[in-house]
Amino acid sequence: MSNERGRGRGGNRGGRGGMEGGSARRGAWRNGPPPAGSFPHSRGGSPALGQSPTPRMSINDHMHDLKIVQGERKGFQTDTDISRAAGPVERELQPWVPDGPSPPPQSNGGSGNADFETFGTTNNITWDQFETNERLFGAKTDFKEELYTTKLNKSGPDFHKREKEAERLAKQIMGQTSKNAHIAEERGQATDIRDEEEKYSGVSRAPNAYVPPSARRAMGQSSAALRPNPTFESNTNGSTPIPAKPASPAAHETAPPAPERRISDDPVGSKPEAPAMKVTGTTIRPITENAEVTVNGTNVTAETKPELSGVVNEWRQFVGTEREKVEAKKQSVLKSEKEKQLADFKKFQANFKVPLPLPKDILPILSKDEAKQKDIEAKATNALQAAKERKLSIAKDSPAKSPVILNSVKSDAPKPAPPKKIVMKIPEIPPFNPAKRKAPAVPVPESATQDIKLITSPAPSNGSLASQATKLNPTASTFVFKPRADAAPFKPGQPSVSPSIAPHQPSAGPSNTSASTAVPKGNAFFRDKLPEKTHINAREDFNPWKHGPVPRPNTVGTGWPYPGRKVGVPPPFMSPAAPPQMQMQFEDDPTSPSPHPAQPAMMPGMPPNYPPYGRFQPGMPPPYGVPGGMQNPMFSPGPHFSPHPGQPMGQPQHMMPGGPQPNMPMYFQNGMPQNPAFLPPQMQQFPHNPQRPGPGPGPGGPQMFYPNQMPPMPHQTPLQQHPVPFSGPSPAQPQFQHQHQHQHQHPHQQAPPPPPVQMSPAHSTPSGPGGVVQGGPQQNGQTQG
């Protein structure tokens, strides 16, 4: 079965498709197809029908001839070779011609034959596609015109007016002509003799369309051939036709474009006799000689010479060649201009030198050799000097020639008058009260009472204009106003007379000179008396201590000698010689601006301040019920810590301790015990503590009383002290004990010696010389440095 297949594989599976090696392969038959009886069941035969008398040709049989041609050709094939080998594939198109005459077209634009075959006779019936479909096929439409356009409001008051206007516009549009064949048929206009292919699928080129020069040479014509053809009008005597004007623009628009005319390239002598041209409007048709020509509705016999087409052809060729010559000349001119401009640029580049000195930093870039650098610098200097000399020579030559040209030219034409000198008129200062002050009577000369006409100056002549022009100085300085020296003096207590400016009159004699009055000379602003010039010494006159010495600081009191709030500045250190009851007071009384001794006033305890946070000694409730006991944060006082002194207490009262004062150490610090050397300052409070004035604890000094038993403190011996430069605590922060004052004493409450520091809550105790604390009525402790 394998050798009977048409796939080309034989029994021995070694052949290429021949009869000896096996069956032929499909598409690989050599030297034509095999005979009909070779393959009973191959292509073209059927097992059921037996052998086919004429087997089918293979679809690749045309490749046989192509392979033969390819075997003969050698080398690479280009596109031209391939297209040439394929042979011409164009065929001539034949227009379709109906079998019988078609009926005339209908008025509604449809084809008469198709309408007659499909819809029957529909003469004088408006075409309605929806009605026709419903009548023939029963298809009803739901078309609504307002879905695609504006809905007409037929009930409007101006509907009829708008309908008439629409009809007028429709008639105007339908009456217009169009070169489009489709639009012309829709408007019912008469069609021309062009066939359907030319009207609907052809390209109609406008008469004045641009045609490139290469296309003109290929077509054998110039652009002049594409101009609109004129309308020929023949004379009655049969002479040469004369171009005539179109009858009307409407007739020119209605005429379709003329068919393309072919122009022969044969010479004039070898041309056969051409038939005459029949002219009707703008359509030209070939007719015989002495034929009738319809011109403006009149039949005229015209004779056209057969040499006309040859002359026109030669004329068009001449115009085309001349146009090409003009274009070539224009291109050559442009090229020469570009070359000239390029030459100018090259010349400028060769001769131009920068008119600036050569920068020093460019020399290493131009050359690395020092000798060459010096040469380059010398050349640049010489070129710069030459450029400057050239400019100076040009500047000297130009002004020397200009006056010669101006003087040599003489013209009788009037020259424009030069600008007149600007005269500034500054009015005098009017009097302060013009109603009370009147101008004194001025003697008026007799000539002023007469009616004298003003004498106008004559028109300036060319000589006067030239003289005025020579007086103008272009290098004059800027105008600066200066007061008149002959102005009348101004006195505030006397009326001032504003001088009147009289018109310029020619001098008539000594009478005019006698009428003028002498005006005293003086300063225009200060008049008679000028102010004396004084010398100002800025260092001496503007010295605030010129009339008094600078007061020493110790002589200035602490009071505020100005009205308003009285302010006193406390000294940073208390004087050791001050009396025990010396205290600083701030009073609004102007009689006591400075501190003075006063008796301790009886007053209740100091009200506690309410800072945000504070801590008290354990076992004592806070004086004001703040939850958590948060009063003051833990902080250490600065080196300049010196609170203001307080006032003594009055009648002893049982009160809770006051809150912590600003800038005071904390009362108590919670937590683990710390190193004494780094222990921050702390304060202790006692609700009732007797006040015992006197000196601080020392050798044999009195001891302080405490409300409860204190642990023994073996620090009673005098220690070596150092002077404290500031009133703040020492680096080794001691512990402070804070106690309120009480007037009466409790002898049974005696305790061991007090700690090193005890302080009243109202003030801090300043230290005296040697660091010893000075006692006072408000002091109940000492500070040990």
UniProtKB/Swiss-Prot annotation:
In a knockout, what does one observe? Abnormal sexual reproduction; decreases MFalpha1 expression and abolishes basidiospore chain formation. Decreases virulence in a mouse intranasal inhalation model for pulmonary infection; virulence is completely lost in a double knockout with CRZ1. Resistance to high temperature; resistance is suppressed in a double knockout with CRZ1. Resistance to tacrolimus (calcineurin inhibitor). Resistance to dithiothreitol (ER stress inducer). Resistance to tunicamycin (ER stress inducer).
Which gene does this sequence derive from?
Answer: PBP1
- Keywords in alphabetical order: Cytoplasm, Phosphoprotein, Translation regulation
Q: Where is the composition biased (Low complexity)?
A: 775-785
Q: What is this protein called?
A: PAB1-binding protein 1
Q: Which family does it belong to?
A: Belongs to the ataxin-2 family.
Here the segments flagged for biased composition (Gly residues) are 9-21
The ranges of region (Disordered) come to: 1-120, 153-285, 403-446, 486-519, 669-785
